[in-house]
Amino acid sequence: MVMAFLDLYKINDCINLDAHTCFGTEESYPNFQKDLEKFKSLLVDLVSNNQSKTFYKFGDGDYYFLRADSVGSASPGRRALSKSYDQINHQDFVDGSKLCDYYTCEIYPENRSKFKEVIPKDINFPAEYGYALVANKWILQEFAGKIGLIGADIKMNIIKNLMEAPQYQEYLGLEKFEDYISLPQRFACDDLEATERMVGEQLKNSTSKIFLMGMGHVKSGLIHRLKKYTDAVFLDVGAAIDALSGIIDIERPYFGDWTNYQIDEMSLYEGVDFLAYVGKGKHILLERE
């Protein structure tokens, strides 16, 4: 854990095991607590007024994807696309990334510098807020009865199955998610139009007023288009979807105290993208009745 983790960066009811040095200096983000309250108030206002707004969470992988650099998750054949960058309309992603309403980025100085290189917009809030407000369940309980999810088909199916268990409902403080909107786990960027059709058709029948999303690099071309299909707040929370799936790396910001609930049925996890999850932290295995 960070040797000098400042109180400035503490958020109620969750623990941050992220060892980045930015959490040890006030200069990283002096208004962290003040802006956290602004962020929460903004979400409440947007949902209560049924405003349709998009939040794009930027990470270092998005930097490489938007530059068409074959690094990590942005490498063809790895996760986002099976084709080479010159075989897709990459410019649609570059242009789309600039068309969202709000932008979040971790307070890591290097990530914020990368953001400014590829997206000519202001960073509105730290991405850590999205993680923490799922980790401490605030967002789940504040918007109970209004929340849907958007993410990889395999993870949506895992969460659906987990939510059948009263024990998991109790842990989240939430009886159900209103909608599960699926997209391909791998290679969703190969055909942006096809992925949009898949997601759009599901959104047309949705009832949620706020969607928590984790959709990989396809978000750069897709997020700004979602408002065409339903009026809702679209909040990109990235790896927080993995937490709801029970497979979060607890060293991700603010998930240090998270319990990964999993189901004793291996077939549910076949082909799932575990990202950095290696089994650390607290786990509860739910048996099928």
Predicted regions and their residues:
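Residue-level detector of flexible, active-site-proximal loop/helix-junction positions
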Residues: 110, 185-187, 241
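Electropositive, gly/pro-rich neighborhoods at or near active sites that engage anionic ligands
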Residues: 2-173
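A mid-sequence, solvent-exposed acidic-amphipathic segment
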Residues: 168-210
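Short acidic/glycine-rich loop or secondary-structure boundary segments that cap or lie
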Residues: 66, 156-159, 188-190, 221, ...
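Short active-site oxyanion
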Residues: 145-147, 208-211
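Conserved beta-strand scaffold positions in the cores of enzyme catalytic domains, especially
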Residues: 55, 149, 176-182, 234
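Glycine-rich beta-strand-to-loop/alpha-helix junction loops that act as flexible
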Residues: 213-216
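C-terminal functional extensions of proteins
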Residues: 218-289
